From Swiss-Prot:
Chain coiled-coil ranges: none
Motif (Twin CX3C motif): 35-60
Single GO BP term: protein transport
Family (UniProt): Belongs to the small Tim family.
Entry protein name: Mitochondrial import inner membrane translocase subunit Tim8
Pfam families linked to this entry: zf-Tim10_DDP
Gene3D superfamilies xrefs: Mitochondrial import inner membrane translocase subunit tim13 like domains
Species: Caenorhabditis briggsae
Domain of life: Eukaryota
Record note on domains: The twin CX3C motif contains 4 conserved Cys residues that form 2 disulfide bonds in the mitochondrial intermembrane space. However, during the transit of ddp-1/tim-8 from cytoplasm into mitochondrion, the Cys residues probably coordinate zinc, thereby preventing folding and allowing its transfer across mitochondrial outer membrane.
Length: 83
């Protein structure tokens, strides 16, 4: 059983890494969808992204990240942890 422990640990580490990658990908898709809806009112991609649209997307993503970080910090404090 001892020889299986390193294999199990390696497998669990790989599983955790893959789960994190999937969560990150899901968050990117969510941000893309929400910010697309906010910044592209006609739902069509422009032939060239202008400065106004680029700024809108940057601000949208930054606000979503800020909100996510705020929620994580708040939940951590509620659970007695420190952020």
């Amino acid at each position: 059983m001892d020889s299986a422990d390193p294999q199990l640990a390696r497998f669990l580490h790989q599983l955790q890494a893959e789960t994190q990658r999937q969560k990150f990908t899901e968050q990117v898709h969510t941000l893309t969808g929400r910010c697309w809806d906010v910044c592209f009112s006609d739902y069509r991609p422009p032939s060239k992204m202008d400065g106004k649209t680029q700024t809108c997307i940057q601000n949208c993503v930054n606000r979503m990240i800020d909100a996510s970080n705020f929620m994580v910090e708040h939940l951590s404090k509620m659970n007695g942890g420190s952020a």
